[in-house]
Amino acid sequence: MSRLHKWLDRYLSSLERDNASPYTVKNYGTDISQFLDYCGEQGIHTLEQLDRDVVRAYMAELNEDGYVRASIARRVFELRAFGDYLVQHDIWDENLFRRIYAPRVPRKLPRYLTIEEVKRLLAAPDTSTPKGMRDRAILEVLYGSGVRVSELVGLDLRDVDLAAGELHVIGKG
């Protein structure tokens, strides 16, 4: 395992300690490790050997491999966060990833359901069964509140206040 990969392991451990989503930790680990593997293939094994040209060449390779702009931009943001960690812990003098520009990703308006689609969706569960009632309640909460599926799955009975008509949700941000 290279020294760079050891820094990555420490960074991922710090994300876990900071209660980052397991998906975030996994995705950051996979993506940053892929970059570090690329560095190793280029003969780069220390932070001192890293420069903007290496990072740009890596981003160009991702582009050539068919990665979409949003995926490349995500990699830049992940590398910036990793670099920030290294600087904050006095491992690296300057986060050169901050000087790499992420590709602009056009923002699309979300596709929304029509009233008819919502009615059909909510009518789909068979509410004559306990499972169907549960599924209908799940759909109602998702549609009516806008919570993420991961937030809904994390709810417990103590998070539901029927008297006040409230759900207590701890979200991402």
Say what each PLM segment does.
Residues 1-173:
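Conserved catalytic core of the tyrosine transesterase superfamily
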